[in-house]
Amino acid sequence: MLLDALIFQPDSSVPDPPPGVTERWITTKDKVRLHAWYAARRGARPTLVWSHGNGGNIAGRADVLLALAARGLNVLAYDYRGYGKSGGQPHEAGVYLDAQAAYDSERRRGVPATRIICFGESLGGVVSIHLASVRPCARVAVVSTFTSMRDVARHHFGPLSFVVGHQFDALARIRDLTVPIFIAHGDCDEIVPFELGERLFAAANQTKRFFRAEGAHHNDVFASPGLIDAIAEFAHAAIADASSVR
């Protein structure tokens, strides 16, 4: 419980969604009610299922959500349990269930797996990699994501990192993914060191792309020139992938 309190830093204050974005409610397998924002575009578009970082809530990246939607993507951004208007309390197994519930809600609405991109930032990237290991999807895109929580703790706390255990281990899952993956990382990231992003990329065995966000830190990475365009281009390629296997 103490470790969860250190890892998860939720904010319960969520404003009304911006124009063009609607609210959704999603219920998880263990009956937790989650709050989500959804931006839709007409036509058979790729859909990003967005898992955010460990702090704040979905409102913190509203500008990025709108920028991705403006590039022709459907975006479902949900809050983990305990974040924003979502019920419950966050813990590792719980946020994995939350991601699965968000994904499943899109499938029930008729979105095929071949148009779903598991998308995550920081801790949410680990959640997205886990999601892609238990649900079929078209592609995975992660930004500022670490190899494991212990590796992040080792960078900040040295020998004391042993108390973290094996929470949020992306390396354990990424090696087995079979879909294309996009990894972006700021080379001045002061929270999740750049080399962890490089290690995560090296561990991926499938088709992959690495985007080095030059001069970007952890919290300003989406301002890196070309990053949002690169994510959108990578996501739209899922449509071509789906067409090629028909």
Where are these regions (language model features)?
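An N-terminal hydrophobic leader/cap segment in hydrolases
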Residues: 1-27, 35, 244-246
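Membrane-embedded segments
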Residues: 29, 33-105, 126
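Short alpha-helix in the alpha/beta-hydrolase fold that links the catalytic acid
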Residues: 64, 170, 179, 193-202
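Primarily recognizes the serine-hydrolase "nucleophile elbow" in alpha/beta-hydrolase
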Residues: 105-109, 114-158, 173
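Short beta-strand/loop motif that positions the catalytic acidic residue
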Residues: 177-178, 183-185, 189
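Acidic catalytic loop of the alpha/beta-hydrolase fold
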Residues: 187-192, 218-219
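Catalytic histidine-centered segment of alpha/beta-hydrolase-like enzymes
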Residues: 216-226
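Catalytic active-site module of serine/aspartate enzymes centered on a nucleophile-bearing elbow/loop
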Residues: 224-246
